[in-house]
Amino acid sequence: MIIKSVAVLGAGAVGSYVIWGLSEKKDIRLGVIASGERAKRLKNKGCKINDTVYHPEVWTPEEAHGVDFLIVSLKYGALPGALDNITAVTGENTVIMSLMNGVDSEEIIAEKVGAEHLLH
């Protein structure tokens, strides 16, 4: 599989690190999934990482639907509220990687979208 589009759900410390690492990859379309005030803030101010401001694309879950690779980097407690967004993003060939703490985030996500989408 060639990865051409990556969405990050959760632009905190871990998600920002992913954004930093992928921002220079010109052959990958990179976006952060957000809505409401968070989306507005990310669009206007970007993500500041080590004194550098990055401006990844900001997508709603529906705009991100069908990305090649979804990175879930939420705090564990936010996962139940994000499952509908994860479902909205996941297309037929989307691969999901959880970078969350806890030992069962992959299983929780798999119950919603199917284990075939999860990278273990």
List where the protein language model places each region:
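NAD(P)+-binding Rossmann beta1-loop-alpha1 motif at the extreme N-terminus of oxidoreductases
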Residues: 1-50, 55
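Rossmann-like NAD(P)(H) cofactor-binding subdomain of soluble oxidoreductases
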Residues: 52-54, 59-120
